[in-house]
Amino acid sequence: MVKRVSKEEMDALERSCSQPFEEERFLIVSGTKWCGNNNIAANYSDLGFLEADKCCRDHDHCDHIASGETKYGLENKGLFTILNCDCDEAFDHCLKEISNNVTTDIRQKGGAENVWRFYFQWYNANCYRLYCKDEKSARDEACTNQYAVVKKNFTVQ
């Protein structure tokens, strides 16, 4: 599968990849501190000027299974962290709320739309769903034996 990217996206990727290996590599969306492959925030309340940064911060703090980690009986053998599908759904909703708000500034709308496109169309990460082995709801605190099942990717509407 081939993905088309803009010149700006390619330039940003090129700059990131050309940094020396000793340096931390950050690909952070301009105007944010949380939207990217890491964060540059000083603390939890440190946000960039784009409203999408709140969505990214919340998404970064979601339940996840890191590469090489086993959790809920699921081993993540992939190169990238996978998140709970509920988190991806909340992230999708948060970004769309910003871009669909008629009173939102055009820069804010564009920022949210760019983050959405990158994550849901270009990156298109897998996610996982939690289930309970004893027929209780996975959201029920009494469920002590949750297990995870990978969903190939979050399907947006």
Curated annotation (Swiss-Prot):
Report the subcellular localization: Secreted
User: What EC identifiers does the entry list?
Assistant: 3.1.1.4
Q: Does the keyword Calcium apply?
A: yes
| Entry GO MF terms | calcium ion binding; calcium-dependent phospholipase A2 activity; toxin activity
Tell me what reaction this enzyme catalyses: a 1,2-diacyl-sn-glycero-3-phosphocholine + H2O = a 1-acyl-sn-glycero-3-phosphocholine + a fatty acid + H(+)
The temperature profile of activity is: Optimum temperature is 37 degrees Celsius. Less active at 25 degrees Celsius.
How would you classify this enzyme at the top EC level? hydrolase
* Glycosylation site residues: N43, N101, N153
Q: Name one GO cellular component term.
A: extracellular region
Keyword list, A-Z: Calcium, Cytolysis, Disulfide bond, Glycoprotein, Hemolysis, Hemostasis impairing toxin, Hydrolase, Lipid degradation, Lipid metabolism, Metal-binding, Platelet aggregation inhibiting toxin, Secreted, Signal, Toxin, Zymogen
Q: Name one GO biological process term.
A: arachidonate secretion
Residues annotated as the enzyme's active site: H59, D88
Where is Ca(2+) bound in this sequence? W34, G36, D60
- Propeptide residue intervals: 134-139
Known tissue expression:
Expressed by the venom gland.
Entry cofactors: Ca(2+)
- pH sensitivity of activity: Optimum pH is 8.0. Less active at pH 5.0 and pH 10.0.
Query: Which family does the record assign?
Result: Belongs to the phospholipase A2 family. Group III subfamily.
Annotated function: Scorpion venom phospholipase A2 (PLA2) that is lethal to crickets and crustaceae. Causes inflammation in mice and lysis of human erythrocytes. Has a mild anticoagulant effect on human platelets. PLA2 catalyzes the calcium-dependent hydrolysis of the 2-acyl groups in 3-sn-phosphoglycerides.
Q: Which PANTHER family match?
A: RH14732P
Q: What is this protein called?
A: Phospholipase A2 phaiodactylipin
Source organism (scientific name)? Anuroctonus phaiodactylus (Mafia scorpion)
